[in-house]
Amino acid sequence: MRVKRGVAAKRRHKKYLKMAKGFRGSGSTLYRTARERVERSLCMAYVGRKLRKRDMRKLWIQRINAAARLNGMSYSRLIHGLSTAGVTLNRKVLADLAVNDAPAFAKVVEIAKAQVS
């Protein structure tokens, strides 16, 4: 019996063209280029999700460092002091405290200062 595969191909083409909506030029209209663009964009999205984690950590460290220096302490001394004091606040929480609750962050810095000196 003869198998006709037009339906499957049409479905696959539609899937890629739907994902390529908004791409420029033939990247959104021609199947072959749309597939290439979509596959590349999915790879870039994967890489971007990894990079975002690095970038956020860098941002948190910059914010903590700036706030720590306002309180007369460097970032590295602050982190060392907190680890020796047994404080288990992560960088995300410390950065949030530094931005949104300066008095609480100052208290944390005092705890670290007591351990370092």
Curated annotation (Swiss-Prot):
Kindly give the PROSITE patterns that the UniProt entry links to this protein. RIBOSOMAL_L20 (PS00937)
Q: Which GO terms describe its cellular component?
A: ribonucleoprotein complex; ribosome
Which Pfam families does the UniProt entry name for this protein?
Answer: Ribosomal_L20
Which UniProt keywords are present, listed alphabetically? Ribonucleoprotein, Ribosomal protein, RNA-binding, rRNA-binding
Renumbered to this chain, the signal peptide range is none
Q: Which GO terms describe its biological process?
A: ribosomal large subunit assembly; translation
Recall the GO molecular function terms of this protein's record: rRNA binding; structural constituent of ribosome
Query: What InterPro entries does UniProt report for this protein, alphabetically?
Result: Ribosomal_bL20 (IPR005813), RIBOSOMAL_L20_CS (IPR049946), Ribosomal_protein_bL20_C (IPR035566)
State the similarity comment: Belongs to the bacterial ribosomal protein bL20 family.
Describe its function: Binds directly to 23S ribosomal RNA and is necessary for the in vitro assembly process of the 50S ribosomal subunit. It is not involved in the protein synthesizing functions of that subunit.
**Entry-linked HAMAP family:** Ribosomal_bL20 (MF_00382)
- Name of the protein in question: Large ribosomal subunit protein bL20
